[in-house]
C-alpha cells in the first residue's frame, strides 16, 4: 500500500493529499483533526514508519504554511507484524510505541510543529496470537520422495490466507506425543481446489494418522472475518478458553444455517 500505484489513499507526489486537506478544512460539515497513513502489513521494524512520519509531518507543515490549517492528530496506521513462524521476530508493542513517538517528536521539532496525538492500529498484533485453530486429520497420503499430504476437516473456507497470500503458519500435533520421526508434510483442506492449503511446509511426525488433532497457531487475525461457506462447508465455532474453563463465543454453523437465506 505504500506506493503510488494503489487504489488506497491520496497521492503526496501529485498533490492530492494537500488538496484533500484543503477540501476537508473548507467543508463546514467536517472537523479536520489530522492525517492517517497505512504502509503495509507484517512490518517488523520502524524504518517504514519513520518514512511515513517524515512525510506526514511534512504535509502537516505544508498545510499550516499554505492553508493555515493546524492538525492535532497523526495516525500511522496498522501493519505491525506478529510471529507466524519461528523466523518472525516482532518488536514488543511497548518498545515499538516508544520508538514511533520519538520519530514523530523529532520530525515535529524539525518543522517547528507542536507534538500531535499519535495513534497506531495494532489489530493483527493484538488478536492474531490470541487464536489457535484445531483441525482433525481425515486422511494421510504419502507421495514417495516428495512429501506427505495430511488432509484435515477444514481448509480455505476457514483460512483462505495461505491460498490468497501464500501465508505461512506453524502447526503442531496436539492430541498426543509423537512416536515417529519427523518428515516434510503439507497440511491441506477438504475443498475441491489444489490450492486449498493450510500449511504449505510442515515437519510432522511420520506416525500421524486419521483422528489426530493438529493445532495451527496465530489464526486470530483475518481468518474468521474472511471465512466462507465454499463447497457448502459450515464455519466452525469459536471457543474462548482460560484457566477457569471455556465458553462458546460463536456456535458451529449447521446445514440449516447454510440454507437459511434460500427462498426459491
What are these language model-derived features?
Residues 1-3, 39, 49-50, 89-91, ...:
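Short, glycine/charged-enriched secondary-structure capping and boundary segments
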Residues 7, 31-36, 71-75, 115-119, ...:
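Structural preference for beta-strand elements that scaffold enzyme active sites
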Residues 1-73, 82, 103, 108:
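Active-site-proximal beta-alpha core segment in soluble small-molecule metabolic enzymes
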Residues 12, 37, 43, 80-84, ...:
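Short, flexible micro-motifs
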Residues 38, 77, 217:
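Conserved residues at the C-terminal ends of beta-strands
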Residues 49, 55-59, 63-67, 72-132:
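Glycine-rich phosphate/ribose-binding loops and adjacent secondary-structure elements
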Residues 99, 105, 113-264:
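Charged (often Lys/Glu-rich) extended helix/loop segments that serve as interaction or gating elements
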Amino acid at each position: 500500500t505504500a506506493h503510488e500505484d494503489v487504489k488506497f489513499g491520496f497521492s503526496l507526489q501529485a498533490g492530492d493529499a494537500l488538496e484533500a486537506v484543503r477540501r476537508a478544512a473548507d467543508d463546514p460539515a467536517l472537523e479536520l483533526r489530522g492525517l492517517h497513513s497505512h504502509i503495509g502489513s507484517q512490518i517488523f521494524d520502524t524504518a517504514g514508519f519513520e518514512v511515513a512520519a517524515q512525510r506526514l509531518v511534512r504535509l502537516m507543515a505544508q498545510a499550516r504554511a499554505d492553508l493555515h490549517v493546524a492538525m492535532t492528530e497523526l495516525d500511522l496506521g496498522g501493519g505491525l507484524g506478529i510471529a507466524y513462524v519461528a523466523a518472525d521476530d516482532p518488536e514488543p508493542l511497548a518498545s515499538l510505541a516508544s520508538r514511533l513517538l520519538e520519530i514523530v517528536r523529532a520530525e515535529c521539532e524539525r518543522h517547528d510543529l507542536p507534538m500531535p496525538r499519535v495513534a497506531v492500529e495494532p489489530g493483527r498484533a493484538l488478536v492474531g496470537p490470541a487464536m489457535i485453530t484445531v483441525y482433525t486429520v481425515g486422511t494421510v497420503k504419502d507421495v514417495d520422495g516428495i512429501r506427505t499430504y495430511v488432509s484435515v476437516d477444514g481448509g480455505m473456507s476457514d483460512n483462505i490466507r495461505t491460498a490468497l497470500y501464500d501465508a505461512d503458519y506453524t502447526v503442531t500435533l496436539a492430541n498426543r506425543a509423537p512416536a515417529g520421526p519427523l518428515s516434510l508434510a503439507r497440511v491441506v483442506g477438504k475443498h475441491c481446489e489444489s490450492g486449498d492449503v493450510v500449511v504449505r511446509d510442515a515437519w510432522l511426525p511420520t506416525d500421524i494418522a486419521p483422528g489426530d488433532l493438529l493445532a495451527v497457531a496465530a489464526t486470530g487475525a483475518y481468518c474468521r472475518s474472511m471465512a466462507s461457506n465454499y463447497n457448502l462447508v459450515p464455519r466452525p465455532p469459536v471457543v474462548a478458553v482460560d484457566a477457569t474453563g471455556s465458553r462458546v463465543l460463536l456456535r458451529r454453523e449447521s446445514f440449516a444455517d447454510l440454507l437459511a437465506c434460500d427462498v426459491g
